[in-house]
A protein has these predicted regions:
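Short helix-to-coil transition segments within interhelical loops
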Residues: 97-101
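Hydrophobic alpha-helical transmembrane segments of membrane proteins
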Residues: 1-92, 102-267
Length: 267
């Protein structure tokens, strides 16, 4: 760990990441194969030969896989802390051995979780971009004898990127979108990080709060799907879930810090 106690939570976050990176790699690898199979399956169907790439993401179920991956990443990122609190890891990894302010433990776990979420978003963007050309080639091959014209793959990709709400989720195109999803990412990462510092019924309560917070993010994403931009109507519809998410994040911090001070996860 670094010598400066002010920034030691960065080292803790890096340590946590190293402990769960294999699980994250397995998760993302399996999801990549599943999404590829779903997209190629739809692209090879004549009924979807003229379907836009954006519509394929929705029709094939690739978007659902993406949502599941984000939720699973939140769980996988907590594995080191949950193992430590249950005594299923090396004795050196325990709350009593961290000689740093307790808030830095929470900050480090939150940062490690947020990094995993960012990695999942970057992976998803890369997968969707990378699969576009082979999927488009399959569509063109299937529809070649039924249509007398084609649209360049590059043009279709640009149109999908410019108009698709799926791409807007993984690569926000406006300052409002970047700020919105940065806030949601920070809040849900914090809520997930608090689960591992509790035990017993408090852990169950923290898990429920994290689940509700994740549900709020899903609702916000749904509002974004049905809105054009971030106008007044969007903020009216998304105001309630965003408020609940913010309140949950604020309420979760005192309880988590108290649990850390009591060393509830130590054995």
């Amino acid at each position: 760990m670094v010598k400066s106690s002010r920034f030691r939570f960065f080292s803790l976050a890096a340590w946590n990441w190293r402990l769960y990176r294999r699980g994250a790699a397995v998760l993302l690898g399996a999801a990549t194969l599943l999404e590829a199979g779903l997209l190629f399956g739809c692209a090879g169907n004549l009924n979807f030969a003229a379907t836009s790439y954006d519509a394929l993401l929705s029709t094939s179920g690739a978007g659902v896989v993406f949502a599941i991956v984000l939720g699973a990443t939140l769980v996988v990122a907590q594995a080191p802390l949950l193992a430590a609190s249950s005594g299923k890891t090396r004795a050196a990894y325990t709350i009593l051995t961290f000689r740093l302010p307790r808030w830095q433990i929470l900050a480090g776990q939150t940062l490690a979780t947020a990094f995993g979420m960012l990695l999942a978003l970057a992976w998803q963007a890369a997968v969707w971009f990378g699969l576009f050309w082979p999927v488009a080639a399959v569509q063109d091959a299937v529809a070649g004898r039924y249509f007398g014209f084609t649209v360049s793959a590059a043009g279709r990709l640009w149109w999908a990127f410019a108009t698709s709400p799926w791409f807007a989720l993984v690569l926000p195109r406006t300052p409002e979108g970047c700020g919105l999803w940065a806030g949601c990412l920070a809040a849900v990462s914090l809520l997930a990080a608090t689960v591992g510092v509790h035990r017993g019924w408090r852990r169950l309560l923290a898990f429920c709060m994290a689940a509700v917070g994740s549900g709020c993010c899903v609702l916000v994403a749904g509002v974004q799907f049905g809105s054009e931009g971030f106008g007044p109507l969007f903020w009216v519809r998304a105001g309630a879930p965003l408020t609940v998410l913010a309140l949950l994040a604020v309420l979760a911090v005192p309880g988590a810090l108290l649990a850390l001070h009591r060393a509830e996860m130590a054995k």
